[in-house]
């Protein structure tokens, strides 16, 4: 079962990305290193609820 999730920057707390994840394979919150246009650098983005 795939669900939509929002990714927020850990530096500025802005919600920059939306993506889908498989809850069966990834039951925990995901963390991805993505580009933040507000920080102008690559930062860790965490899943928000």
Curated annotation (Swiss-Prot):
A single Gene Ontology molecular function, please? structural constituent of ribosome
Alphabetically ordered keywords of this record: Ribonucleoprotein, Ribosomal protein
Q: Which GO terms describe its cellular component?
A: cytoplasm; ribonucleoprotein complex; ribosome
Give a yes or no for keyword Membrane in this entry: no
What is any one GO biological process for this UniProt entry? translation
* Annotated family: Belongs to the bacterial ribosomal protein bL33 family.
Query: Which PANTHER family does the record match to this protein?
Result: 50S RIBOSOMAL PROTEIN L33, CHLOROPLASTIC, LARGE RIBOSOMAL SUBUNIT PROTEIN BL33C
Q: What is this protein called?
A: Large ribosomal subunit protein bL33
Q: What is the lineage of its organism?
A: Bacteria, Bacillati, Bacillota, Clostridia, Eubacteriales
